[in-house]
């Protein structure tokens, strides 16, 4: 989860372990890489990483919950050098990162990540828009950790996104707690 405000204190009340990464791809990648290294040093294995987070979507209604196991970058643009939008040049990591689904009972969606609070339709094909998912997925891909995400749609990625995001945080936090409990049961 990027921000403590997204959990509305519900994770702390229930002693649910959570890593708050901070906003954006760099913060997310750095904090998760450190946490995975520490976990591997202490336990000898990597945990399954689940990203609970809020998203905008021009396709899905506010209040929707979607599971993501495919992730793309919506702001990687090296088209001027002939590369496809969303592709990081000169590396072997595919532009779409895909993992085994962790939440097959939920609607599935593609998460488009970028370091900008989106208020319009993204230029890459994705169902939901966030600021950390692809970075977390890439760290897990490179480290060999299982990864998935549960995303709560707070807004339509439009001109009202900021207000709608804040208004829907309590609903999002309750949904995250519910899906965390289901993950433990399943």
Predicted feature descriptions by range:
Residues 3-5:
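Gly/serine-rich nucleotide phosphate-binding loop at the start of the catalytic core
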Residues 7-186:
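Glycine-rich phosphate- or other oxyanion-binding loops that anchor nucleotides, phosphorylated ligands
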């Amino acid at each position: 989860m990027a921000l403590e405000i997204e959990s509305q204190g519900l994770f702390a009340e229930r002693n649910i372990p959570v890593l708050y990464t901070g906003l954006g791809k760099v913060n997310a990648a750095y904090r998760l890489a450190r946490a995975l290294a520490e976990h591997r040093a202490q336990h000898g294995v990597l945990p399954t990483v689940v990203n609970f987070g809020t998203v905008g979507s021009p396709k899905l209604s506010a209040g929707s919950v979607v599971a993501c196991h495919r992730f793309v970058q919506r702001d990687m643009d090296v088209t001027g050098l002939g590369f496809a939008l969303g592709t990081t040049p000169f590396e072997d990591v595919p532009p779409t990162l895909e993992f085994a689904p962790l939440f097959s009972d939920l609607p599935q969606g593609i998460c488009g990540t970028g370091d900008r609070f989106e208020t319009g339709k993204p230029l890459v094909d994705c169902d939901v828009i966030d600021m950390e998912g692809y970075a977390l997925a890439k760290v897990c891909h490179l480290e060999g950790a299982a990864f998935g995400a549960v995303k709560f749609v707070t807004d339509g990625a439009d001109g009202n996104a900021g207000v709608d995001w804040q208004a829907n945080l309590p609903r999002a936090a309750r949904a995250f707690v519910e899906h965390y409990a289901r993950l433990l049961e399943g």
